[in-house]
Amino acid sequence: MKSLLFAFLAFATLSAASPKRTFVGVITDDMCAAKAGHATMRMGSTDAECTIACVDAHGAQYVLYDGKTAYSLSDQRTPQQFAGRKVKVTGTLNEKNKTILVTSILAAK
């Protein structure tokens, strides 16, 4: 019975999910994104250093910030190499919690 319920919930979640999209923004951390920049925290000499320091030392999470919204990312490993840089993130957005189920992250031009 539990497996049937789990299968139903998984199907309902997948069918409610939006299709894959590409989002453009900067990889930063949720602490600095909440303050709309690194000026307040400034944990390094660059935005990339600040982002990585906030994640490593302060328990922050990598996010994609598009200038208005900070999207949580399901992948918390790949973003480190793009910290402080403009990227294209492809994935499926969960509208309720603003989390992108990441398929790929590529540098944007």
What are these regions (language model features)?
Residues 2-3:
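Bacterial Sec-dependent N-terminal signal peptides
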Residues 6-17:
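Hydrophobic h-region of N-terminal signal peptides that target proteins for export
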Residues 16-109:
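Conserved RNA-binding domains used in RNP assembly and mRNA/RNA metabolism
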